[in-house]
Swiss-Prot record:
Belongs to the TACO1 family. It comes from Acinetobacter baumannii (strain AYE). Gene3D superfamilies: 1.10.10.200, 3.30.70.980. This is Probable transcriptional regulatory protein ABAYE2155. GO terms for cellular component: cytosol.
Length: 249
């Protein structure tokens, strides 16, 4: 759990940086369009849509913008050619990387993703080369650890698979199928999460103890997330305490 918490801190910091770049709106709109297209326009019955709508609202996207994106999805406008494609590869130090994209032009996306790996001494692999190292699961996080007992009671009753508690975070883990039900149960109990999403979680970790390698891994993640077609980047990296302190400096 400590590794999750440390990496989460970096993710949260990066999320703020990404928002300042102004690209997060485009990525959320694409996700809303696709989620609505695949699962319908009602967030109450579409957990994927509900999760991204909550994220969009958290970065001050207007309801009008969100609703227009939902209508684009269910109406099939402008997104018929948008495809979800996942790329796999390795960064330095044997770090496994999954890159989820939404693209209307594979001839643009593939070279862009490959360039990010090659510029940071990594390698873009073939389908299946690292996917087996990750498991799809729901993650619902709370920063208020004083709510541990109540969260545990509600989440487990609603079908959560596991709950991990650190000194600064509670992580509720669900299957992708029960994610929405557990999220609803927690919300109904007055427990507002700080983040909720279905992710690809690594089953093993690649620890990086060298600061130069750590910087290359972070550069790879930054470069990938800067690509317009990239929606999510998942890795199995775990930085040592010493490296993390230097990255945070």
């Amino acid at each position: 759990m400590a590794g999750h918490s440390k990496w989460a801190n970096i993710k949260h910091r990066k999320a703020k940086q990404d928002a300042s770049r102004g690209k997060v709106f485009t990525k959320y709109i694409r996700e809303i369009v696709t989620a609505a297209k695949l699962g319908g326009a009602d967030p109450a019955s579409n957990p994927r849509l509900r999760a991204v709508v909550e994220k969009a609202l958290s970065v001050n996207m207007t309801r009008d913008t969100i609703n227009r994106a939902i209508q684009r999805g269910v109406g099939g406008e402008d997104n018929d050619d948008l495809k979800e494609v996942t790329y796999e590869g390795y960064g330095v130090g044997g770090v496994a990387v999954l890159v989820e994209t939404m693209t209307d032009n594979l001839n643009r996306t593939v070279p862009d993703v490959r360039h990010c790996f090659s510029k940071t001494n990594g390698n873009l692999g073939t389908a299946g080369s690292v996917a087996y190292l990750f498991t799809k699961r729901g993650e619902i996080t709370f920063d208020d650890v004083s709510l541990e007992d109540k969260i545990m009671d509600v989440a487990l009753e609603a079908g959560a698979e596991d709950i991990e508690v650190s000194e600064d975070e509670i992580l509720v883990i669900t299957s992708p199928e029960t994610f929405g039900e557990v999220q609803d149960a927690l919300a109904a109990a007055g427990l507002k999460s700080d983040n909720a999403e279905v992710v690809m979680s690594p089953s093993t970790k690649a620890e990086i103890t060298d600061i130069d390698q750590a910087k290359q891994v972070m550069k790879l993640i930054d470069m990938l997330e800067d690509l317009d077609d990239v929606q999510n980047v998942y890795t199995n990296v775990e930085f040592s305490d010493e490296v993390l302190a230097q990255l945070d400096a």
